């Protein structure tokens, strides 16, 4: 019997459990990640992606970066958490593991969302431009899912292999791959 409280299947399907990454983030960032991470696994792809996009649209860049705790600050020799401007985050804060996990998801192209994971990695490294990349990736996926493409055609557009007939149908519609 599946344990939908402690270990929901839709969070265990990836290279690691989603909570391993989301617990490293403040509320807004953790929710955006959660909805993208699971969007194909719960059967409500567009709804989950719209929720992720809502969080991305309403958060400040610093709300989409990993949280650094007192323990992280002590590693730098500080007695209390440090307030560090975005531009300095790349150099000033210790890595709490989020950047590694984001790279794992990007390299695995988890859920076909490598550009989103890369954007979140850029944000975690202090680059505000990552927010634009993350938003574009989610918006693009929503428009693809709302289109009249077949599942095989979507797999091709995501970079996955699909039956040759799907490629022919896309080419007939004017899509070049």
Task: Describe the function of each predicted region.
Residues 1-177:
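Intrinsically disordered, low-complexity regulatory regions
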């Amino acid at each position: 019997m599946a344990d939908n409280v402690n270990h929901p299947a839709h969070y265990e399907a990836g290279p690691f459990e989603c909570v391993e990454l989301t617990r490293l983030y403040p509320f807004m960032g953790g929710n955006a990640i959660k909805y993208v991470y699971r969007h194909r696994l719960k059967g409500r792809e567009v709804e989950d992606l719209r929720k992720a996009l809502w969080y991305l649209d309403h958060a400040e860049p610093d709300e989409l970066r990993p949280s650094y705790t007192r323990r992280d600050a002590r590693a730098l020799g500080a007695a209390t958490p440090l307030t560090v401007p975005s531009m300095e985050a790349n150099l000033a804060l210790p890595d709490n593991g989020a950047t590694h996990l984001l790279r794992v998801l990007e390299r695995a192209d988890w859920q076909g969302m490598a550009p989103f994971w890369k954007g979140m990695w850029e944000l975690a490294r202090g680059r505000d431009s990552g927010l634009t990349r993350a938003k574009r990736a989610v918006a693009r996926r929503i428009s693809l899912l709302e289109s009249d493409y077949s599942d095989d055609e979507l797999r091709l557009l995501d970079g996955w292999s699909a039956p040759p007939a799907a490629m022919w149908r896309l080419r007939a519609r004017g899509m070049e791959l």
